[in-house]
């Protein structure tokens, strides 16, 4: 099993505070039933969100959704 580290995600989102916000927002989406962009397996929503960010499927744009 590949382990996801914060460093893997910081390559995609350089600001650690933006990374925290994006990962938390995406984890809430996944926990609420949104389909994952990576194979979820038996991982928790937070790990799935970090894997999506590290893979480049999700970025800071997730924070702008729903705004005009």
Curated annotation (Swiss-Prot):
Q: Which UniProt keywords apply?
A: DNA-directed RNA polymerase, Nucleotidyltransferase, Transcription, Transferase
- Check the record and name the InterPro entries matching this protein: DNA-dir_RNA_pol_omega, Pol_omega/Rpo6/RPB6, RPB6/omega-like_sf
EC number, as in UniProt = 2.7.7.6
Tell me the Gene Ontology biological-process terms attached to this UniProt entry: DNA-templated transcription
One GO cellular component from the entry?
DNA-directed RNA polymerase complex
Task: Return the Pfam families for the record.
Answer: RNA_pol_Rpb6 (PF01192)
A molecular function annotated in GO for this UniProt entry is: DNA binding
Please write the reaction equations for the catalytic activity of this protein: RNA(n) + a ribonucleoside 5'-triphosphate = RNA(n+1) + diphosphate
Database matches in SUPFAM superfamilies: RPB6/omega subunit-like
Q: Share what the entry says about its subunit structure, partners included.
A: The RNAP catalytic core consists of 2 alpha, 1 beta, 1 beta' and 1 omega subunit. When a sigma factor is associated with the core the holoenzyme is formed, which can initiate transcription.
HAMAP family to which the protein is assigned, alphabetical: RNApol_bact_RpoZ
For this protein, the record's PANTHER family field holds:
DNA-DIRECTED RNA POLYMERASE SUBUNIT OMEGA
Q: What does this protein do?
A: Promotes RNA polymerase assembly. Latches the N- and C-terminal regions of the beta' subunit thereby facilitating its interaction with the beta and alpha subunits.
The name on file for this protein is DNA-directed RNA polymerase subunit omega
Question: What are the leading ranks of the lineage?
Answer: Bacteria, Pseudomonadati, Pseudomonadota, Betaproteobacteria, Neisseriales
